[in-house]
A protein has these predicted regions:
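Conserved glycosyltransferase catalytic-site signature
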Residues: 11, 123, 149
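Alpha-helical structural signal in soluble globular domains
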Residues: 16-20, 94, 132
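Beta-strand elements within well-structured catalytic alpha/beta cores of enzymes
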Residues: 3, 114-121, 125
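Internal catalytic-core helix/loop-beta-alpha segment
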Residues: 72-106
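Amphipathic alpha-helical segments that form well-ordered structural scaffolds
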Residues: 13, 86, 90-94, 125, ...
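Phosphate-coordination/substrate-recognition cap region in phosphate-metabolizing enzymes
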Residues: 1-69
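A short, terminal or domain-edge coil/loop segment
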Residues: 54-62, 80-93, 157-173
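Acidic, low-complexity terminal tails and accessory targeting/binding regions
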Residues: 34-52, 101, 105-116, 127-173
Length: 173
């Protein structure tokens, strides 16, 4: 199953794969670039949340915490958690359609399968999706990884116990 951002760059990238595979993609608004604009320390205007100077974000321990990264004044003012919850909620709805239901920090494999799910999206939102699936702060992904345009990230589910699935990333970018 193929899903694509409504934005041009991702649609253009998807078009080549879709044409070769003779497939179509469902457009999902939540796959657009992650939108919140935060006023970074020492700045006067909003900027994307995934492009900070290292000393600015690394000085705040909360940014490393999967449960509290969004609780800083900067992110609260930018409504980052609300956007994060919307995006990850939509991801969970999509995964439910494919047989995986979020249960705390893992997924229940209610209809285990070998579906391949392909998402054509953008770096900022990719890191949001990965942070949710891997249970880590997106700040570490936004600032510790780099995915060039048209890069491919691969995840799979691991079901070591019947009905319990977790996601593993086998390649990034």
């Amino acid at each position: 199953a193929y899903y694509v951002s409504p934005l041009g760059r991702a649609k253009d990238t998807a078009s080549l794969t879709l044409k070769k595979a003779c497939r179509t993609a469902e457009t999902c608004s939540w796959l657009r670039e992650f939108a919140p604009q935060a006023v970074h320390p020492g700045k006067d205007s909003g900027h994307c949340v995934w492009d900070w100077l290292p000393d600015a974000w690394m000085a705040e321990p909360k940014y490393f915490d999967k449960d509290h990264w969004h609780e800083t004044e900067v992110f609260q003012n930018a409504h980052v958690k609300e956007e994060y919850d919307w995006v990850t909620g939509e991801l969970d709805r999509l995964l439910r359609r494919h047989g995986y239901v979020r249960n705390g920090l893992f997924y229940r494999a209610v209809a285990p399968n070998e579906d391949t799910i392909v998402l054509f999206c953008h770096f900022g939102v990719e890191c949001v999706l990965l942070s949710h699936l891997l249970n880590i702060s997106p700040m570490q992904l936004w600032h510790g990884t780099c995915a060039a345009p048209s890069s491919v990230t691969v995840l799979y589910t691991e079901e070591r116990r019947s009905g319990v699935a977790s996601f593993r990333m086998s390649s990034f970018g």
